[in-house]
């Protein structure tokens, strides 16, 4: 479908929540995207509504195919393979234990459950970092806000204000728009949840 036809269709059936650049991507390989007119672009986007894995990477496609043949998705109310391993890997990386993370990643990739389980157990003197898995930046940001307020409440210090940087963007939910501190994004949705204060980055 041409860009013009796609624009016409979306003008009728897709909510106009933000402006779009007049380009329709129809294919991607590696970091190259191809528009409907055949023009190629380099994909440098990361962090806003994107999946930063490249396009058509054989290793990613193979992993996706293998996983979807086994199990597509289940609720997080159940245990699933590799969630604990990935969380252990992230904890090691947060501790700057690159070598330990590499050994753990290799064991996970090789399917060596015994080694991966042993390596994943924290050492007695190891700082353990817990992971909250989220499916979007807004959900991750709201999760961090909830954790900060829960920590302050449990610490008994009465702190419940989140400090936000002016000019930042934290998501499209009501709470993350309140944290975004940009009037042009907030005006249409007032009143907003409270508990945020803005500061200007230096």
Residue ranges and their predicted role:
Residues 23, 154, 187-189:
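Short secondary-structure boundary/capping segments
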Residues 29, 44-46, 165:
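A secondary-structure boundary/capping signal
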Residues 35-36:
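Short, acidic, Ser/Thr-enriched surface-loop or helix-capping motifs
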Residues 40-155:
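Glycine-rich loop-to-alpha-helix module at the N-terminal edge of alpha/beta enzyme cores
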Residues 144, 162, 196:
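Conserved hydrophobic/aromatic pocket- or pore-lining residues that grip, position, or stack substrates
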Residues 165-202:
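PLP-dependent aminotransferase-class I/II
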């Amino acid at each position: 479908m041409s860009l013009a036809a796609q624009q016409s269709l979306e003008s009728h059936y897709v909510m106009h929540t933000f402006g779009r650049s007049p380009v329709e991507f129809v294919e991607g390989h590696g970091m190259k995207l191809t528009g409907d007119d055949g023009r190629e672009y380099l994909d440098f986007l990361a962090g806003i509504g994107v999946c930063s894995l490249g396009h058509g990477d054989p290793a990613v496609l193979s992993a996706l195919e293998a996983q979807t043949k086994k199990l597509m998705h289940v609720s997080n109310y159940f245990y699933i393979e590799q969630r604990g391993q990935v969380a252990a890997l992230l904890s090691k990386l947060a501790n700057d234990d690159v070598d330990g993370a590499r050994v753990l990643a290799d064991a996970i990739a090789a399917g060596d459950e015994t080694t991966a389980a042993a390596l994943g157990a924290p050492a007695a003197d190891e700082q353990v970092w817990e992971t909250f898995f989220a499916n979007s930046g807004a959900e991750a940001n709201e999760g961090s806000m909830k954790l900060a307020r829960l920590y302050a409440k449990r610490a008994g210090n009465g702190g419940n204000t989140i400090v936000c940087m002016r000019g930042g963007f934290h998501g499209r939910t009501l709470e993350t728009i309140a944290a975004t501190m940009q009037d042009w994004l907030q005006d249409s949705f007032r009143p907003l949840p409270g508990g945020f204060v803005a500061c200007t980055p230096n």
